[in-house]
Curated annotation (Swiss-Prot):
Organism, scientific name: Rhodopseudomonas palustris (strain BisB18)
Gene name linked to the record: eno
GO CC list: cell surface; extracellular region; phosphopyruvate hydratase complex
Pfam families given in the database record: Enolase_C, Enolase_N
Main subcellular location of this protein, as a coarse class: cytoplasm
Protein's name in the database: Enolase
Residue sites binding (2R)-2-phosphoglycerate per the record: 163, 337, 366-367, 388
Enzyme Commission designation: 4.2.1.11
Amino acid sequence: MTAIVDIIGREILDSRGNPTVEVDVVLEDGAVGRAAVPSGASTGAHEAVELRDGDKERYFGKGVLKAVEAVNGEIFDALGGMDAEQQVQIDEIMIGLDGTPNKSRLGANAILGVSLAVAKAAAESFDMPLYRYVGGTSARTLPVPMMNIINGGVHADNPIDFQEFMIMPIGAPSFSEALRMGAEVFHTLKKSLHDEGHNTNVGDEGGFAPNLKSADEALTYIMRAIEKAGYKPGEDIALALDPASSEFFKNGSYVYEGEKKARNIDAQAKYLAELVGRYPIVSIEDGMAEDDFEGWKQVTELIGDKCQLVGDDLFVTNVERLSDGIKNGRANSILIKVNQIGTLTETLAAIEMAYKAGYTAVMSHRSGETEDSTIADLAVASNCGQIKTGSLARADRTAKYNQLLRIEQELGGQAKFAGRAALKAFRYLD
């Protein structure tokens, strides 16, 4: 019934107009699973490798025909006839077939597309939603959204050094209400920026990209927008940051171009602590650079009991890097990006390891996205309680929010919104 009879890869476009891989997996009973693979702009040095063609005459070298060829050729040859419900074995076969530590031969984009499409095909065959197929009967927690409403760094053409300024509606009673609260703040912020002469065009992830010079200036605008929308900062809606510090860590210092200032490792950790003291910031992602292990240890000791410290480039959804971080006291949370590691099995293993260590997990999109909403289902399947999938603009972002609305409606009275409990491990929310 669930035997794989065909795997079809193709080249499609992501939200930035760059090629990416989409895969259909067809089963013997006619069930079809489809998955499209995202792509990042600020990528960690230790991520699994997405395979690009390198042909400068085509998409400036960013084509993915080699990855598509791997899907339609080697990977299908290896997986044809297998049962789609054998997810772990299927993923292990693809990892072995690739034969490299970072999936660089076949491409993580090829392998992930197949891995996710297999799971979706199996779910379709069993007539189950993906979140239920992957997560079982306990999958019913709707995540708190981290909504990226001001963009900076490599996600926007402006002077702000930090990459993302986010709001988290922790005080909402349901996911649908959290979405409404976030949308109201988003539109209030847009009006405030417009009225003060700022550009209200949006960046890669749907947030505004005004010409502000510092994190303080961006946070002040957001605080005012929360209040103008009728909410209490820190009680109804909290703040979250993604500095993406690896992008501006140079020769042992954090170089703030917008502020025309450099901070050493000690100063960077103290600066983040100061921001947490001045604003209701409950989560900071990549506050230190990916290989600044001493900096990570410092900031974790300094504010780890007051703030969720999320490792993205630090961990790259990799159990080996996560295990090392846990042993050495780096961070207290992991960002989960399926394309950083390249298979569903490895993604779920990273989440499980985080949970066992008392770390939180945040399901995440990439800046180059598609209409694929798989991560919405995976957030519910894993009961991770938090999702980061952009702003309240651009269909590639709202596709995930809309899928979560559907899931909440489908679950009905069984649905549970994570709310403040998503961050219950940290005393500032007790």
